Amino acid sequence: MTELLGSYVPIAIFIGIALVIGLALLVAPFAVAFKAPDSEKLSAYECGFNAFDDARMKFDVRFYLVSILFIIFDLEVAFLFPWAVSFKEMGWFGFWSMMVFLLVLTVGFIYEWKKGALEWN
């Protein structure tokens, strides 16, 4: 048991060093930075002019929907590549499990299409 856990010691040391360096990089600017706020430093600056309007714009919900659909189908491709590489070793169970996965995604895509979620009218 100790031999098994002993092989993880370098990984634990690496994670510990990474955490210490990350926290040091997060805390260092607050400890070292010179703070002298004035009206010009606190004002909004945009291309040499004061801001004309509020920088926050309302986005249509369809942009978020398209981005979520992109992420879903991008993950589908990420699952398809390892499946295609190890297709011969997995046999029929791997084939049919991927077909079920693709069927669920296809049904979801058809549902989104029929509901009109992809229409931009």
Curated annotation (Swiss-Prot):
Topology term for the membrane: Multi-pass membrane protein
Catalyses which reaction(s): a quinone + NADH + 5 H(+)(in) = a quinol + NAD(+) + 4 H(+)(out)
GO molecular function (one): NADH dehydrogenase (ubiquinone) activity
A GO CC term attached to the entry: plasma membrane
Gene3D superfamilies: NADH:ubiquinone/plastoquinone oxidoreductase, chain 3 (1.20.58.1610)
UniProt keyword Cell membrane, yes or no: yes
Superkingdom field: Bacteria
Pfam families the UniProt entry points to: Oxidored_q4
Keywords: Cell inner membrane, Cell membrane, Membrane, NAD, Quinone, Translocase, Transmembrane, Transmembrane helix, Transport, Ubiquinone
Compartments reported by the entry: Cell inner membrane
Enzyme kind, highest EC tier: translocase
Transmembrane domains' residue ranges: 11-31, 65-85, 90-110
EC number: 7.1.1.-
Membership in a protein family: Belongs to the complex I subunit 3 family.
Oligomeric and partner information: NDH-1 is composed of 14 different subunits. Subunits NuoA, H, J, K, L, M, N constitute the membrane sector of the complex.
Role according to the record: NDH-1 shuttles electrons from NADH, via FMN and iron-sulfur (Fe-S) centers, to quinones in the respiratory chain. The immediate electron acceptor for the enzyme in this species is believed to be ubiquinone. Couples the redox reaction to proton translocation (for every two electrons transferred, four hydrogen ions are translocated across the cytoplasmic membrane), and thus conserves the redox energy in a proton gradient.
Matches recorded under PANTHER family: NADH-UBIQUINONE OXIDOREDUCTASE CHAIN 3
Entries under HAMAP family matching the protein: NDH1_NuoA
Protein name stated in the entry: NADH-quinone oxidoreductase subunit A 1
Organism (species): Rhizobium meliloti (strain 1021)
Lineage per the UniProt record: Bacteria, Pseudomonadati, Pseudomonadota, Alphaproteobacteria, Hyphomicrobiales
Gene name tied to this protein: nuoA1
